[in-house]
Amino acid sequence: MKLHEYQGKELLRRFGVNVQEGKVAYTPDEVRDIAREYGQPVVVKAQVHVGGRGKAGGVKFSPTPDKAYENGQNILGMDIKGLTVKKVLVTKAVDIDAGTEYYVGMIVDRNVQSYTLMASAEGGMEIEEVAAATPEKIIKYRVDPITGLRPFEAREVALQAGFKGNLNKIADMMVKMSEAALKMDAVLVEINPLFVDESGTPLALDTKFEIDDNAMYRHKDLAEWRELEAEHPLEIEASKYGFAYVKLDGNVGVLGNGAGIVMTSLDVVNRAGAKPANFLDIGGGARADIVYNAVKLVSKDPDVKSIFVNIFGGITRADEVAKGIIQALNEGILTKPVRMRVAGTAEEEAKALLAEVNSPLIQMYPDMFQAAEAAAQEANKVEAK
């Protein structure tokens, strides 16, 4: 279950994280009233379950209550990537120049069956862009789900990432974020930016928080927070299949097994000159029917012009992946070019199955870089028409 920014901040606040003060508004009048109450410049932020709100005009600085009213009028009812803005978060503005922005996040990595902590001094940017341009600037650290993130580990990660300021305070916030992720069964928690002021005090300015749908029975008090109409239809469908799926802005569908492999796949697609249209982790040990459903899901996205499949077979058999893709092809569901790299268990069997089909839509490559390059070329070729 995806949470809105204000909901994610509320959960983090419950775990002791210092978050930016703000209130939710549903009308321009409410936006103005909140701005007047705060008595200082505010930021009006669209609350929708997609990224890129700022680029779409859904985040506006408002120096006065009247400007806040105007911005509220413009943002409420706005369409952002197919979702209508029905509410906004009005927060006290922060002077970004009077401090430093960082990034911290926790994600479930199915490959290592654990959480991975990520930290970067490149805060305020989309982490996918940082990963694509300068992956060395993202520090990753495996977090034991039994012990959680310990203070000395958090300090070491902050130091490696190049964080400045009071590292003890920053580490304390990272530990509390880790506690929130573990206790709330989150599959993703991000604080971006994590703002550190001149005194060294950290403040969470923006958040992403997503809870595992399979664990919602443990968090029945949050059930009323879910707004299906506020979620992308493909993400709703993905949750029914049990997929870890996130809709993105690009034109290349991405399908892989394990969060680490999928994150890497996003990076190589960016480097190849295209943009990923989604994050889709089919998990470990996926059978042909699971792969079939994954291909069907990605194929429904009109933004997808080609599909990049990146599988490293361990408990996931490559021939099962091939069977699922072939079934989608035979049923006429797969109509977009698939460029894939499959390695590991039953790799040769997969190659034999695909060679027998001999479809120009499906091509295999010896490594993920070549496959991603081919997928990017196919997608960009369609876009250029």
From Swiss-Prot:
Residues 9-237 form the ATP-grasp domain. The keyword Nucleotide-binding applies. Pathway: Carbohydrate metabolism; tricarboxylic acid cycle; succinate from succinyl-CoA (ligase route): step 1/1. It comes from the Bacteria. GO terms for cellular component: cytosol; succinate-CoA ligase complex. Pfam families: ATP-grasp_2 (PF08442), Ligase_CoA (PF00549). The keyword ATP-binding applies. Its cofactor is Mg(2+). Heterotetramer of two alpha and two beta subunits. This is Succinate--CoA ligase [ADP-forming] subunit beta. It comes from Deinococcus geothermalis (strain DSM 11300 / CIP 105573 / AG-3a).
